[in-house]
Amino acid sequence: DEVDAETLAHAGLVQYAVIFDRIFRFAITGTRVRNYDAVGGQLLFAWLHQHGVLHWTDTSLAFDWDGVAEQVIALSDKINDLYWRSIDRPKMAHWLAAYELVRSTLTPHPASVWAQGLPTEVLAGAPSGYTNAVLDDEFPLSMFFEALEKKMRPVIASTEGIRG
């Protein structure tokens, strides 16, 4: 009917909006201190790039839109499986599994204690030891995001205080 046709006409635009919002907004506008929304955007960007549906050169960003949905679903399946398995394991083991999922796509900070392997005293201790070992910027921005942030910094600064 007419409502379904209108909804379908806008569905593709919603896909673009969600992808661009997730990839760009938090990664370059937020603080780097334990900014997990930014890590989510970085993860999505890297996943799409590593699975051949996002392509970046020094001056051009392109998407293979026909393959994007399939790859977003594949990443979602990995995350859903992580959460599904969480019911069968202790919290700290789940945290380690979550870290490995992110680390399988994003490169952790070279000084990361998590990436090097948490010491036995942390592994055997309270959950606070795990969270205290996380660096403020555990997964630093990639070169793509560094270059984008540098180019966008003046634009972002010019919008400070604007409310809509």
Please give the residue ranges for each predicted region.
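Extended, compositionally biased alpha-helical segments that mediate assembly or anchoring
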Residues: W84-G164
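Accessible peptide chain termini
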Residues: D1-E2, G164
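Long, well-structured alpha-helical subdomains associated
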Residues: E2-L118
